[in-house]
């Protein structure tokens, strides 16, 4: 068992009428299993990305830099926005290139996520770590715990499969092609066998 990892929180930097975020897609290494190092992908870190915090009716501007050495993208899953800012398979970011989307947040308060959506390799890149959570706040947000990482806990559940050397195995069996990829190890925020000790009586998991 090990302490639950909590992704860092990025609420952006407000200037020139928008809330600005700087996101770097990068390669890294992460220790999932004792004594083993695993090659991963991450956003502003080795594995997964920071939790982005948006506000409803606020304009956000994002600088997405692709430093992983292959084409990628970032898609804002569940958001209502123009197709030019969507980050879908039609908006590939070439290696060593930068994409600068911006949009008005029209979503109500909720929990969303962002992830690679590049053609042909989205599954593999997300499997290796190119994904993160988005929290949207609005003026009608109910009075529930909202102290991030203290009584408001992000829970990113993933199933993964590892080789004996700690490497991530993706679609490496025939049945994966037929029935879909299913790992044999559960992760929570990239942590195997996580433990959390609540410091409050009321705890929010999202």
Go through each PLM region and give its residues.
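Histidine-centered copper-binding motifs that mark active-site loops
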Residues: 1-206
């Amino acid at each position: 068992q090990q302490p639950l990892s909590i992704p860092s929180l990025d609420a952006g930097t407000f200037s020139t009428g928008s809330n600005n975020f700087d996101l770097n897609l990068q390669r890294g290494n992460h220790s999932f299993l004792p004594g083993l190092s695993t090659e991963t992908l991450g956003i502003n870190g080795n594995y997964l990305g920071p939790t982005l915090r948006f506000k409803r009716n606020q304009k956000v501007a994002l600088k997405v830099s692709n430093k992983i050495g292959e084409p990628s993208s970032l898609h804002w899953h569940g958001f209502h926005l123009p197709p030019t800012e969507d980050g879908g398979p039609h908006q590939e970011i070439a290696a060593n290139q930068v994409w600068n989307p911006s949009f008005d947040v029209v979503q109500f308060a909720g929990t969303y996520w962002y992830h690679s959506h590049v053609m042909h390799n989205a599954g593999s890149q997300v499997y290796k770590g190119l994904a993160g959570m988005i929290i949207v706040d609005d003026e009608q947000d109910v009075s529930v715990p909202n102290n991030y990482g203290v009584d408001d806990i992000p829970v990113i559940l993933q199933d993964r499969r590892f080789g004996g050397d700690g490497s991530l195995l993706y679609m490496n069996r025939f049945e994966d092609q037929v029935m879909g990829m299913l790992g044999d190890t559960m992760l929570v925020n990239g942590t195997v066998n996580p433990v959390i000790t609540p410091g409050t009586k009321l705890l929010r998991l999202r």
